[in-house]
């Protein structure tokens, strides 16, 4: 379809409400938003070297708030609905995948509950997603 696809992966279990820094990954069907952002010349590009090797399995790790803000800015630039996939890690071994579509025309984010929604940590995962 002609809806851009973006994937975000949350690696730590800290809630957004606590203000803790989060490490995440973003993919898109048309290429990486992070790679297309200011990785080569921005001051935040040095933060990517601070990412742990355990995250190397992800396509692109976002290690700073500036990186996350740049990805969000690029997602919000679309004038057509954007498909966003969010992977939240509940534990080291368990994660849930949330599929969503952001419609920029009416500023509504549609979120589908994951089919593999595990009872363990489900409240925390849902709160973290919000």
UniProtKB/Swiss-Prot annotation:
Domain of life from the UniProt record: Eukaryota
Low complexity composition bias: residue spans: 32-51
Biological process annotations from GO: positive regulation of protein catabolic process; viral translational frameshifting
Biased composition (Polar residues): 17-27
Cross-referenced InterPro entries: Acyl_CoA_acyltransferase, ODC_AZ, ODC_AZ_sf
UniProt keywords, alphabetically: Developmental protein
Assigned protein family: Belongs to the ODC antizyme family.
Protein task: Ornithine decarboxylase (ODC) antizyme protein that negatively regulates ODC activity and intracellular polyamine biosynthesis and uptake in response to increased intracellular polyamine levels. Binds to ODC monomers, inhibiting the assembly of the functional ODC homodimer, and targets the monomers for ubiquitin-independent proteolytic destruction by the 26S proteasome.
Subunit note: Interacts with ODC1 and thereby sterically blocks ODC homodimerization.
Alphabetized PANTHER family for the sequence: ORNITHINE DECARBOXYLASE ANTIZYME
Protein's UniProt name: Ornithine decarboxylase antizyme
Species of provenance: Drosophila virilis
């Amino acid at each position: 379809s002609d809806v851009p696809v973006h994937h975000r992966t949350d690696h730590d279990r800290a809630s957004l409400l606590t203000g803790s820094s989060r490490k995440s990954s973003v993919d898109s069907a048309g290429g990486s938003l992070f790679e297309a952002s200011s990785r080569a010349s921005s001051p935040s590009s040095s933060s990517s070297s601070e990412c742990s090797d355990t995250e190397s399995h992800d396509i692109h790790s976002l290690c700073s708030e500036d990186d996350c803000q740049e990805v969000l800015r690029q997602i919000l630039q679309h004038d057509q609905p954007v498909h966003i996939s969010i992977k939240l890690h509940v534990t080291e071994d368990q994660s849930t995948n949330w599929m969503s579509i952001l419609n920029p025309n009416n500023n509504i984010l549609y979120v589908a509950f994951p089919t593999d929604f595990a009872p363990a940590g489900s409240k925390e995962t849902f709160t973290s997603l919000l």
